[in-house]
Amino acid sequence: MGLFNKKFSIEVMPKTAQKVRDFSEILPSKTLVYIAHLEDTDISDMKQTCIRLIDEDMIPMPHIPARILRNSSELEEWVSQYADVGVKRCLLLAGNNKTPKGSLHSSIQLLETGFFEKYGYEYINVAGHPEGNPDIDKSSKLTETLTALKIKNEYSKTTSIKLGITTQFCFDLEPVKNWLRILENEKINL
């Protein structure tokens, strides 16, 4: 494990996690493991993956994509099921679907339900897009993306839950450095 003495996170899907014999044999204790929730993934598979990761001394961070949820009742069901097995963190996303399955279409809507406070979550991450996101910002500017982060930043001031930003990996450092300067100038402190 000498190579892995720095903090890092990884991402798995329930199906690929099944191929790993024991996460504690390949990852340092308390590694943050994001669990991608694709549209065809059943919540029971997500929950079982969380249980397994906790049992193997990892920290599960399930994705909760707004656009695959039918309604806020289903959201509460997922949030409570995760909490029941010891999940204290999650990553909220709008999701890749162009058309929402129900009335929820943004991570802001998920935050505003109050379910995460109700079920004792401690950390919530939201998506960041240093290189932009064409689904959000139709131009090359980050206007809509930054507006969403400002709303989430304001929300973070009203809750005891710690909010953070998760980004996908990037191949070019310059857009990341530029994005961090923009966040600092806009006083976005997630």
Describe each model-derived feature in a short phrase:
Residues 139-186:
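Hydrophobic, aromatic-enriched interface-forming segments
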Residues 1-147, 154:
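Active-site beta->alpha loop and helix N-cap motifs at the rims of alpha/beta catalytic domains
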